[in-house]
Amino acid sequence: MTNSSIDSKSDLIRRDPVLGSRRLSNYWWATVILVGASGFFLVGISSYFGFNLVPFIKSEEILFIPQGLVMSFYGVAGILLSVYLWLTIIWNVGEGYNEYNKQDGIVRIFRWGFPGKNRRIDLVYPIQDVQAIRVEIKEGINPRRVIYLKIKGKREIPLTRIGQPLTLGEIEEKAANLARFLQVSIEGL
């Protein structure tokens, strides 16, 4: 393959990776919740049996009903939440890519989901059905900056990752580059 064929292929195919659940914040929260919930659960169980399972807390002084029972309940709930977070990290839910292929005339939005019948989420549309790129910007306490792909006769498909919002400059640049590549208009700016 020559350099010119590589360059022409990159002019025809664009693939943007999308980060899934394997983000630093998910690892952090899954670990913190597991450690905290395990502590609650151990203190609750210690109050039931009347001896310390956690050496630096005097849990035999805690009455099982109601404090120990409530702590055990919160511990179990926290452990279950942590297991859920760890499973989404292991399965890498949400990871995938957005592919725009002028060569084959398709737009493919691919994501990994939860195990089961719909594990692979693969949306394929003809590239000529793309109407526009829409940008949604909401400021405030919970800012939202999302790029959407508008498809004829279908609902809008979000293309940006969830998590830390992009800066205004980054979102404008990404939307403009994508609209230029697909040769469609930008809405919402």
From Swiss-Prot:
- Please provide one cellular component term from the Gene Ontology annotations of this protein: chloroplast thylakoid membrane
Q: Which GO terms describe its biological process?
A: photosynthesis
Q: Which residues cross the membrane?
A: 31-51, 70-90
- Which keywords describe this protein according to UniProt? Chloroplast, Membrane, Photosynthesis, Plastid, Thylakoid, Transmembrane, Transmembrane helix
Cell compartment(s), UniProt: Plastid, Chloroplast thylakoid membrane
Instruction: Say which domain of life the source belongs to.
Output: Eukaryota
Q: What kind of membrane protein is this, topologically?
A: Multi-pass membrane protein
Give the similarity note. Belongs to the Ycf4 family.
Stated role:
Seems to be required for the assembly of the photosystem I complex.
What's the protein here called?
Photosystem I assembly protein Ycf4
**Taxonomic source organism:** Chlorokybus atmophyticus
Q: List the gene name.
A: ycf4
